Amino acid sequence: MSRAARVALSVVVAIATALAGYALADARNAGATTALGPGLVTVTVDVHYSKFSLEELHVHAGTTVRFLIHNNDPIRHEFIVGDAQVQALHEKGTHPAHPPVPGEVTVAPGDVGETFYHFDEVGRVLFACHLPGHLAYGMHGWVTVSRR
């Protein structure tokens, strides 16, 4: 292969790699602009200074989301996804920690937690941290579920 061909191939590979990285970053940060699913999708949520990096997520009905929660804070947090009844139970402080229940996870400082939630019905679903004062501080967001 000639030197010019090797240079051209290197440029094409570099551009393709950059575009692939951009596409991956876009999927990770889709948030409010792109409806994900249906099927299984993974969404990463970082916690820093008692704030979720994700404020809003759009999915299609029939989507199961695997939430990966990276707790970068020096304190414990939780990530609870669910309807008003689920949120009300947790706001009353009924659970000090969360066993493996779909849509619920407690994450220790510096740790990564995982939970799955299947979105069937069109509407809005809240996610929040209900540890004392965290919800009022702004640790919450919404998942908007739309028809496919």
Model regions: which residues?
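N-terminal Sec-pathway targeting helices
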Residues: 1-10
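Asparagine-centered strand-capping/turn motif at beta-strand->loop junctions
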Residues: 69-71
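Extracellular/periplasmic metallocenter environments
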Residues: 21-22, 26-30, 102-148
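Beta-strand signatures of extracellular beta-sandwich domains
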Residues: 78-82
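Short aromatic-acidic-glycine turn motif
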Residues: 85-95
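N-terminal edge beta-strand
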Residues: 35-64
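Hydrophobic membrane-insertion alpha-helices, especially the h-region
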Residues: 10-21
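Extended, low-complexity, turn-rich repeat/linker tracts enriched in Gly/Pro/Ser/Thr and Asp/Glu
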Residues: 73-76
